[in-house]
Design a protein with these regions (language model features):
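Alpha-helical transmembrane segments of multipass membrane proteins
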Residues: 153-157
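Transmembrane alpha-helices of multi-pass, membrane-embedded glycan-processing enzymes
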Residues: 54-58, 123, 175
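Physicochemical signature of membrane-embedded alpha-helices that form the seven-helix bundle of GPCRs
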Residues: 167-168, 199
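Lumenal/periplasmic acceptor-binding loop at the mouth of the active site in multi-pass
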Residues: 1-70, 96-99, 105
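Alpha-helical transmembrane segments of multi-pass membrane proteins
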Residues: 121, 148, 169, 173-180
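Transmembrane helical bundles and short interhelical boundary loops of multi-pass, membrane-embedded
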Residues: 77-138, 178-180, 185-223
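Membrane-interface helix caps and helix-loop-helix hairpins in membrane proteins
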Residues: 158-165
Length: 223
């Protein structure tokens, strides 16, 4: 599997990188056909903006409590230092993957073949250490959602081949869970948030109805 994904050099006009998926910068376009009577049908792959975009602040809000909690145990400073090193390495790994994507599109990619396995091992070790710190310091429910989301998304950082927006779909259920988790926390802190949460859900459902024809291939009038 690694050999296939690391050596595939094909490109596609609708390809997109992992860092573009949460913001839907490059959706996937499958099919379009003009029908009789001024109608058209098409199939695309993209998400609900109010779900995918809201997932970004939801993830940040979930991670903030982890950063605020302090440990009084002996060696906590060393632990925090190691955790910061792990986070910095994951950021470096993400930036490296962007560089590899660009070099591969220009005919390069030898750097990934040389350093790829080593970076994978360090990336997994850093992620596991950070996960251990979150387990001992944070909310277990929030940790599960963040960990599941990361497991679905982060491996694509290590894939130099062309990728598409639909590779993000397995992460979307956990995005929705993180949004609901944040909504519950907001409502618990202040009941006034309840009506705004209901407005958000109603608008998100409305957008689903609006986009459904171009997601499912339902014929619609061109205008």
């Amino acid at each position: 599997m690694y050999e296939y994904h690391s050596k595939l050099e094909a490109t596609h006009p609708w390809q997109s990188s992992w860092y573009e998926w949460p913001t839907m910068i490059r959706p996937m376009y499958y099919y379009c056909q003009t029908l009789r009577d001024g109608m058209k049908e098409g199939i695309s792959a993209f998400g609900n903006p109010l779900v995918w975009w809201a997932g970004i602040p939801a993830l940040i809000l979930i991670l903030l409590p982890f950063g605020r909690r302090r440990s009084n145990r002996l060696g906590s400073k060393t632990s925090q230092w190691l955790q910061s090193i792990g986070c910095e390495f994951l950021v470096f790994l993400a930036l490296w993957s962007v560089f590899v994507k660009q070099s591969s599109s220009n005919g390069g990619g030898d750097s990934w073949k040389l350093y790829g396995p080593f970076l994978i091992v360090l990336g997994v070790a850093s992620a596991l250490y950070i996960a251990y710190q979150l387990v001992t310091r944070g909310d277990k429910k929030a940790l599960f959602m963040v960990f599941a989301y990361a497991v679905q998304l982060l491996p694509w950082i290590l894939v130099p081949r062309c990728t598409f927006a639909y590779h993000y779909f397995p992460s979307v259920p956990f995005v929705a869970m993180m949004i609901v988790y944040c909504m519950v926390k907001l409502v618990d802190s202040d009941k006034k948030w309840f009506k705004w949460c209901m407005v958000y859900l109603a608008v998100a459902f409305f957008l689903f109805l609006v986009f459904y024809p171009v997601l499912s291939g339902q014929p619609i009038y061109e205008q």
